[in-house]
């Protein structure tokens, strides 16, 4: 009997003890200090759970690696501006297709809504500065007025690549797209109210940087004010503003660097005989074929070689020869006299369309003939102009007339004591600056300047030579062409192999033998 009473008391004690454990919240601890994360009783330092980077709208993941950048064919132009060199490109994202007319018209629609020219005639300059130059279709001895009038506006051309856009306009579009995507994410997550966008006018509009700095006050959504809001203040109450540390917003869209664009164009992952497809499975460190063109089949030719109804068809939209932009009636070879749909032709190994032909594309880099030799061998890029947030006398940031946070160049005085760079503007570093022997007298001895930007890829009006991703040309950043469009890219945060992958090799730990 006594034993029975003892067992009852013991069971009761266990139950009471477990009830106490159930009500006690477990916290992650800092491996550096031992303090709890996200615990209001221990300082309230908020640390989000590790998150994988989501793939932004329109993008595909490009796993980085090493490749030989530069010419793959004889330099028939005699430019000697694409000397082969091995470089490494970090993983990144790039648009699956070129930016289409319908995408760019969405940008113009937003500008018209926020910067209403009827309410303020001064806003007309903002709209005009963003509009594509449709007059690029004109030629002295060709009838192209239908393209001037309708190519950008008519719904028949919705999914055709936008042209007549300068490098500066493409750069501004990338900034706008970054802000709209992040604003959309916050609305979908319930942290920003959709009703709030109705009151946006002039500089009072959402940009990612102004929101993060608190210069733009968004109207909180239902998710932000809910008790289920996972974001907390140090005191443990729901937090209405999102920070970059929360892992919800994406990095900025931007123009791809030349090395990124060229690497993505080849799609070399398709030339790996056994690529790694999941964590723990090692792939071959091998590229089986050196490609001339982006497509995966017949990598050195221009036609489909596999049997079937498409046997012999062109693999890109380009100009076969003088006076031949499409072939003969009843058997058109590329089925496009001018541009074609941004999703036409085969995608390459990374799933990217039209990296050769259709339209050539702007990349971020400033042009120099010998950039291949001068630039770093990891993430090479020429065009750095280091910036910082502009602050007024009180030390506060401010926004400009477009709602963007004002930025200013890092001065040479600020850079002089640094080991890794000594000037703020290094566009002409080792090629046009005082340290080099090169002299660029723009308009006198050369057409190369610090505003010359690279474009790549060949177009509907180019011969096959320009379809090789290794070829490169340049144009001033404020000029446009009927043969040049663009696509956007985005930095990759996290494992270079993609989501659900680790960074670095993890070996099974073994005890040392004594």
Regions from the PLM with identified roles:
Residues 39-50:
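Basic K/R-rich, polyanion-interacting modules in nucleoproteins and related proteins
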